[in-house]
C-alpha cells in the first residue's frame, strides 16, 4: 500500500491539475479511455494470472462466515473527488452489517491524481477499521489472527486485504485514468469464489463472482475470446453466480437494449449469462435504478451513490443476503450522508 501511495503522490506532482469538474457528473460521459479496451484486458489478464492471490478471500473469513450464510454490498458511480463522505459511509455500513464483500460498479473516482490519493486513503482507513474489528494481535507469534476462529492463520498487517472489489467505469479512464485505477486495483477482469459448503459427494461448493471490463461500451475482441475460452468459468461446483458490469445491458424502465453495447455483444452477453447460470447481473453507468427478470436472470441497475448526482439521502446501495441453503434476499440500503453546503 505504501509503494502505491508514493506512486500516486509522484504522479499527482507530475500532472498539472487543470481539469475542472462539473457540479453534477454526466452518466453517459464519453465512452472512451486513455488506454483502449484491448490493451486494458491484455494487461488485466496478465496481472490476474500473476497475482490471482489478490482476488481470493481470506480462508479464515470463509470458514467463519460464508458457510452459515453471508451478505455482500454493492454501490455504483461514486465519482469521488475531495469529498469522501459517501464512500466512507458505504464502507462503514458494510462493517456494521458484517458484509463479506464490498463490490463497486465503476466510475469510482473522477480522474485527477489527487482524487485517487483521497480514494486510496479512504480504502486505507477502511482497511484499518476492518482489521480492528475482525483481527487481534497474538504475542506468541507476533501476528494478527482472526477473532473467534481457533487455529487461524497468523498474518502481518500488510497481508490482510480489505475485501473491496470494483469494476472499471468510463469516467475512471478519461484523462488517462487507467494508470491510476490499475495501480490501486490491478485487474479490471477477474473472478472471485466464495466457499459456501459441501455437496452430497463431499465436493466444495462455491458462489462465483465475475467482474467484466465494459468501461468502453464494448467487451473488445480479446475479452470475448477469453470468455469463450472459459477463463471466467471457474473450476468449482457453483451454487450462485453474480456478474458485475459498469455499462448497463438494458435501458432503465424500457424493454430495449441500451445503445452502448454493439447489438451482437449484447446478445453474446445474454447467452453467456445463461451459460454461467447467472443469478444476478449488476450494472451501473446510467445513474438510474432499474430491476427486471430476463431469461431467469435478475438484472439490477443501480443509481449513483455520488453526493453530487444524488445530493439527498436515499437508498443508493444494494445488499444481497444469502442463507446457508443459497436462498437470496435483496434489499436496498439507505445512505444518509449529505455534503456540507459551500
Each model region followed by its residue ranges:
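Outer-membrane beta-barrel translocator/channel fold
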Residues: 116, 251-265
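Bacterial N-terminal signal peptides that target proteins for export
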Residues: 1-7
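Histidine-centered catalytic micro-motifs
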Residues: 243-249, 279-289
Amino acid at each position: 500500500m505504501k509503494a502505491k501511495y508514493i506512486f500516486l503522490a509522484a504522479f499527482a506532482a507530475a500532472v498539472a491539475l487543470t481539469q475542472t469538474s462539473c457540479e453534477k457528473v454526466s452518466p453517459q460521459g464519453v465512452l472512451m479511455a486513455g488506454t483502449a479496451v484491448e490493451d486494458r484486458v491484455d494487461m488485466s489478464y496478465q496481472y490476474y494470472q500473476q497475482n490471482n492471490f489478490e482476488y481470493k478471500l481470506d480462508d479464515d473469513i470463509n470458514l467463519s462466515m460464508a458457510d452459515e450464510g453471508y451478505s455482500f454490498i454493492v454501490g455504483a458511480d461514486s465519482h469521488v473527488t475531495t469529498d469522501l463522505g459517501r464512500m466512507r459511509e458505504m464502507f462503514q455500513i458494510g462493517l456494521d452489517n458484517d458484509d463479506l464483500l464490498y463490490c463497486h460498479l465503476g466510475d469510482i473516482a473522477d480522474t485527477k491524481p489527487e482524487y485517487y490519493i483521497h480514494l486510496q486513503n479512504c480504502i486505507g482507513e477502511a482497511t484499518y477499521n476492518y482489521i480492528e474489528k475482525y483481527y487481534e494481535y497474538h504475542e506468541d507469534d507476533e501476528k494478527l489472527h482472526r477473532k473467534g476462529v481457533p487455529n487461524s492463520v497468523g498474518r502481518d498487517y500488510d497481508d490482510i486485504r480489505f475485501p473491496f472489489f470494483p469494476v472499471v467505469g468510463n469516467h475512471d479512464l478519461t484523462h488517462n485514468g487507467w494508470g491510476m485505477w490499475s495501480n490501486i486495483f490491478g485487474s479490471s477482469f477477474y473472478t472471485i469464489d466464495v466457499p459456501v459448503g459441501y455437496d452430497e459427494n463431499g465436493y466444495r461448493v462455491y458462489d462465483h463472482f465475475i467482474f467484466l471490463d465494459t468501461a468502453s461500451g464494448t467487451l473488445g475482441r480479446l475479452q470475448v475470446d477469453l470468455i469463450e475460452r472459459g477463463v471466467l468459468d471457474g473450476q468449482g461446483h457453483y451454487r450462485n453466480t453474480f456478474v458485475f458490469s459498469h455499462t448497463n445491458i438494458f435501458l432503465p424502465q424500457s424493454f430495449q437494449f441500451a445503445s452502448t453495447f454493439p447489438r451482437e455483444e449484447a446478445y453474446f452477453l445474454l447467452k453467456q449469462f445463461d451459460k454461467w447460470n447467472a443469478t444476478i447481473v449488476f450494472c451501473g453507468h446510467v445513474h438510474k435504478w432499474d430491476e427486471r427478470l430476463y431469461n431467469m436472470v435478475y438484472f439490477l441497475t443501480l443509481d449513483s451513490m455520488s453526493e453530487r448526482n444524488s445530493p439527498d439521502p436515499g437508498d443508493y446501495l444494494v445488499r444481497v443476503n444469502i442463507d446457508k441453503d443459497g436462498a437470496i434476499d435483496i434489499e436496498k440500503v439507505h445512505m444518509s450522508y449529505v455534503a456540507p453546503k459551500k
